[in-house]
From Swiss-Prot:
Naturally occurring in which organism (per UniProt): Arabidopsis thaliana
Domain remarks in the Swiss-Prot or TrEMBL record: Contains four C-X9-C motifs that are predicted to form a helix-coil-helix structure, permitting the formation of intramolecular disulfide bonds.
Stated name of the protein: NADH dehydrogenase [ubiquinone] 1 alpha subcomplex subunit 8-A
Main localization, broad class: mitochondrion
Subcellular location: Mitochondrion; Mitochondrion intermembrane space
Protein family: Belongs to the complex I NDUFA8 subunit family.
Amino acid sequence: MEANAAVDGTGNPIPTSAVLTASAKHIGIRCMPENMAFLKCKKNDPNPEKCLEKGRDVTRCVLGLLKDLHQRCPKEMDAYVGCMYYYTNEFELCRKEQEAFEKVCPLK
């Protein structure tokens, strides 16, 4: 398995920093309800145990999204993730790959 791979051999997402950074805009849009529910829970209850299920909801959403993105645009996602990995998550150096990724897998 390559260090810059977005998924493992079985097609499950590998949430490395490069994968998460490359997918951050999509995560922010698609998983907003889960993230907001988790943040609201954390704000309202200082007991971490009370928010574990909300945290699992966020994780489930992100992993599902990563799998979906990789199924819909594997070549573009792998190129963008590979660039982000190579350049240590420097967006400015990966704009060409980002544009290709967002063209095939648009933000919605």
